[in-house]
Amino acid sequence: MATKLKITWVKSAIGYAKNQKLTVATLGLKKLHQSVLHDDTPAIRGMIRTVNHLVTVEEVEA
């Protein structure tokens, strides 16, 4: 089965660089403590690496 990533926004992006705010939005996160599911791809992993201090990530079997 394909692995998916559950990404949860846990810390506000206020005071951080604009590219980090845009990355949070690109991941599909609109509100704090919201979670989204994404396929485990190198592009998504790169975005997570950019904002790893603002989000938590869990691997989910889908």
Swiss-Prot record:
Keywords: Ribonucleoprotein, Ribosomal protein. GO terms for molecular function: structural constituent of ribosome. GO terms for cellular component: cytosolic large ribosomal subunit. CDD domains: Ribosomal_L30. One of its GO terms (biological process) is translation. Pfam families: Ribosomal_L30 (PF00327). Gene3D superfamilies: Ribosomal protein L30, ferredoxin-like fold domain (3.30.1390.20). Part of the 50S ribosomal subunit. Belongs to the universal ribosomal protein uL30 family. NCBIfam families: rpmD_bact. This is Large ribosomal subunit protein uL30. The gene is rpmD.
